Amino acid sequence: GPRTRRVKRSHNGKNGSPEEKRPRTAFSAEQLARLKREFAENRYLTERRRQQLSRDLGLTEAQIKIWFQNKRAKIKKASGQKNPLALQLMAQGLYNHSTVPVDEDGEEI
């Protein structure tokens, strides 16, 4: 199965008890190769396909689902696609999560 890393626990402000954070999954080379192959065939999984991958790879369905979500998000970010609502809000000057420096008029420097 996948290896997981130890987690440093942070204390939350309310009751001082450590917040449980799920450790990051370290996929094996074989698991990654299979996930990438499946993703190349289809960027979205059916429930049946997710269950089959879970059995084949020794991962939970949630781990597989999240891997696919993260992979889609990474591709979307790399391709520069913008959400239509984000574009509309940016046009109104209400939304800018860009890391490009801009002047006081919102023009790129």
From Swiss-Prot:
Basic residues composition-biased segments: 1-12
Molecular-function annotations in GO: DNA-binding transcription factor activity, RNA polymerase II-specific; RNA polymerase II cis-regulatory region sequence-specific DNA binding
DNA-binding residues: 20-79
GO biological process, one term: neuron differentiation
One annotated Gene Ontology cellular component of this protein: nucleus
PANTHER family in the record: HOMEOBOX PROTEIN ENGRAILED, HOMEOBOX PROTEIN INVECTED
Name of this protein: Homeobox protein E30
Organism: Apis mellifera (Honeybee)
Lineage of origin: Eukaryota, Metazoa, Ecdysozoa, Arthropoda, Hexapoda
